[in-house]
């Protein structure tokens, strides 16, 4: 169930679903697994807000366990494509593709709430049953290319070397807010809508 908010206007009352009301304030909620439908919705909202006024920041709140690499990179590419700065605010968790998206916010405008967590790891993939060996080799090669691409993005976003990212992402690498700040993925820890 999506909450509805009532707003008083000069013409009377107007009801909005909560996400539409937040969008009026340039707030986008990226929650749950990153997948194509969710990514298309996020991209449409980014493009809409940028077309509306590209001199104002967009606020992207993130609570995601990650998901599809292609869907996540489509969001990141759109964040980089538009003129508006995209502030990222991690609440809860930014894991896997969630980390790639969150760390790709405008430099100096990447935030995290104090009890949120970050996770980096190598990308996962599979070919499913009944796959012939040559297709498995192709899938493995593509997975290596994807890993290199994601490690480059994380390196650019954190200031860490690709070698360090590769080492840390070999297994699940969890970070709390202070560790994420020290690592370079965020710029500030936010508490009570104030920077800490």
Swiss-Prot record:
Catalysed reaction per UniProt?
A: Hydrolysis of proteins to small peptides in the presence of ATP and magnesium. alpha-casein is the usual test substrate. In the absence of ATP, only oligopeptides shorter than five residues are hydrolyzed (such as succinyl-Leu-Tyr-|-NHMec, and Leu-Tyr-Leu-|-Tyr-Trp, in which cleavage of the -Tyr-|-Leu- and -Tyr-|-Trp bonds also occurs)
Q: Name one GO biological process term.
A: negative regulation of DNA-templated transcription
Asked whether the keyword Mitochondrion is assigned, the reply is: no
Predominantly, its location class is cytoplasm
Enzyme class, UniProt record, top EC level = hydrolase
Active-site residue numbers: 96 (nucleophile), 121
One GO MF term on file is: serine-type endopeptidase activity
**Keyword Protease carried by entry:** yes
Query: Which UniProt keyword terms apply here?
Result: Cytoplasm, Hydrolase, Protease, Serine protease
| Database matches in CDD domains | S14_ClpP_2
Record localization: Cytoplasm
Q: A GO CC term?
A: cytoplasm
Give the EC number. Answer: 3.4.21.92
Q: Which PROSITE patterns match?
A: CLP_PROTEASE_HIS (PS00382), CLP_PROTEASE_SER (PS00381)
Checking HAMAP family in the record gives: ClpP (MF_00444)
Which family does the record claim for this protein?
Belongs to the peptidase S14 family.
According to UniProt, the name of this protein is: ATP-dependent Clp protease proteolytic subunit
């Amino acid at each position: 169930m999506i909450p509805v908010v009532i707003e008083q206007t000069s013409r009377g009352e107007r009801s909005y679903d909560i996400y539409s009301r937040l969008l009026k304030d340039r707030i986008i909620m990226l929650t749950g697994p990153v997948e194509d439908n969710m990514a298309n919705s996020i991209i449409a909202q980014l493009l809409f807000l940028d077309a509306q006024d590209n001199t104002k920041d967009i606020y992207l709140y993130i609570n995601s366990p990650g998901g599809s690499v292609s869907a996540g990179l489509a969001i990141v590419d759109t964040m980089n494509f538009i003129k508006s700065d995209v502030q990222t605010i991690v609440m809860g968790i930014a894991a896997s593709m969630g980390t790639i998206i969150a760390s790709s916010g405008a430099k100096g405008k990447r935030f995290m709430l104090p009890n949120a967590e970050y996770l980096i790891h190598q990308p996962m993939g599979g070919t499913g049953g009944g796959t012939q060996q040559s297709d498995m080799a192709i899938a493995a090669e593509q997975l290596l290319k994807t890993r290199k691409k994601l490690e480059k993005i994380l390196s650019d976003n954190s200031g860490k070397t690709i070698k360090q990212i590769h080492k840390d992402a070999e297994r699940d690498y969890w970070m709390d807010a202070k560790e994420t700040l020290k690592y370079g993925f965020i710029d500030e820890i936010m508490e009570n809508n104030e920077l800490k």
